[in-house]
Every structure is written in structure tokens, then in C-alpha cells.
Regions:
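Cys/His-rich Zn2+-binding cysteine-cluster or related metal-binding knuckle/ribbon modules and their
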Residues: 2-8, 17, 27-92
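Solvent-exposed alpha-helical segments within well-ordered globular domains of core cellular machineries
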Residues: 9-13, 27-31, 42, 46, ...
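Conserved, well-folded catalytic cores of nucleic-acid-processing
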Residues: 14, 18, 36, 51-54, ...
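Conserved phosphate/pyrophosphate-binding and hydrolysis machinery centered on Walker-type P-loop NTPases
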Residues: 19, 38, 51, 63, ...
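Extended interfacial segments that mediate partner engagement and assembly in macromolecular machines
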Residues: 26, 75-143
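Core recognition of P-loop NTPase motor domains used across DNA-transaction enzymes
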Residues: 40, 45-48, 59, 71-72, ...
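Long C-terminal interaction/binding lobes of large macromolecular proteins
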Residues: 129-198
Length: 198
């Protein structure tokens, strides 16, 4: 990219490192940022820096938050006896958009994938098992319906069954290989309502 200044080239290169942003999209974003008013660029840069410096894991469910406990875990209006296990914070947000689920969550931050070298110790399973020491009555497994998601669901089910806690899996309706964050709210709600015991 010798036809751009080194500063523009550097911005395009950094933007293209973001997931889902190819070279052309990075170029469009770079030129858009450059054309923005300075104050707006500073707010954007500040928001990114603040998020990076202040966002952490909720100490209970491991979603991303800027407080010790996320708003869901700290809410007395939620059913803390029901835990929905999801792969990532985006999946949690997808279920929250339905407005119907009133339990709490546990975010694994991944799924078991032997092909990628991700085992049970690489995701938040130990922390899930520690949470089950309380008054939990049901664990709803809402991992993606991919091979990795199904593997993770079966592994979790085998871990929890001996405890006597009810273990359910969201119903199909979520397409095989589908990522929850891209599924519409009605489909997610039907999958939740049609969950089955494992």
C-alpha cells in the first residue's frame, strides 16, 4: 500500500486484524475515521481504551462486565436456582433479547474442541461445578448445535448428572452448526421452552 501514507497504512492494517474485517472494509473504516470530527475520533478511541481497561469477567457467571458482579447476577429478581450455560457473552445477549428467560447464566468462553486443542480445562467448567454447590435446581445447556457445542453439552451433562441436579438441553429449532448470536428471538425462545432432559 505504498500509495497511502504510512499512518493510513498502519490504521488499515490494524483495522484489518479485527474479526470479520477484510482489507476493503478496513480501508473504508480507516477513511471514515479520518473524515470524522476530531472529538468523535477521541470519543471512539476513549471508549475502546476504557472498555479494554475496565471490562472484566463477572466473578460469578464470567460474562463481561465493568463491575465485580454483572447486573444479572446481582439482581434479586432473577431465579438463581436455574443456570443457563452458554459458550460466550454474545450468546447470553441473544437470550436476554427474548426478555423471557429469568434465570442466571454461566459463560464458558469456548467449547471443547479436540481438533483445536481446546479441552475441558480450557473453558470455565471448573467454575461451573463450583457454582453447583449452592441451591441450583436446573442447568440448561445452551451451547451451539455444532460438533463442539454438542461435545461440550454431553461432557457437562455427564459431569452434572451424578449431583442430582436437573440437566436440560435447549431444543432443536436452532439449526445444526448455527451460532446462537445470529438466531432470532422467537427461535431462541422456542428452543428454550422445548428443552429436554439429558
Amino acid at each position: 500500500m505504498d500509495y497511502y501514507s504510512s499512518q493510513i497504512t498502519k490504521l488499515i492494517e490494524e483495522l484489518s486484524k479485527l474479526p470479520g474485517v477484510g482489507a476493503k472494509s478496513a480501508q473504508r473504516l480507516a477513511f471514515h475515521i479520518i473524515s470524522m470530527p476530531k472529538e468523535q475520533v477521541e470519543r471512539l478511541a476513549g471508549a475502546i481504551t476504557d472498555a479494554k481497561n475496565n471490562i472484566r469477567y463477572c466473578r460469578e457467571c464470567f460474562t463481561l462486565t465493568d463491575q465485580e458482579l454483572c447486573p444479572i447476577c446481582s439482581s434479586s429478581g432473577r431465579d438463581h436456582a436455574t443456570i443457563m450455560v452458554v459458550e460466550n457473552t454474545r450468546d447470553l445477549a441473544a437470550y436476554e433479547k427474548t426478555g423471557k428467560y429469568q434465570g442466571v447464566y454461566h459463560v464458558l468462553h469456548g467449547a471443547i474442541s479436540p481438533m483445536l486443542g481446546i479441552g475441558p480445562n480450557d473453558i470455565k467448567l471448573k467454575e461451573l461445578m463450583q457454582r453447583l454447590q449452592g441451591d441450583v435446581k436446573e442447568v440448561i445447556i445452551a451451547t451451539n448445535s455444532s460438533l463442539e457445542g454438542e461435545t461440550t453439552a454431553m461432557y457437562i451433562s455427564k459431569l452434572i448428572k451424578p449431583t442430582g441436579i436437573r440437566v436440560t438441553r435447549i431444543a432443536s429449532g436452532v439449526p445444526v452448526g448455527g451460532d446462537l448470536e445470529y438466531i432470532d428471538e422467537v427461535t431462541l425462545l422456542r428452543a428454550l421452552e422445548g428443552r429436554v432432559d439429558l
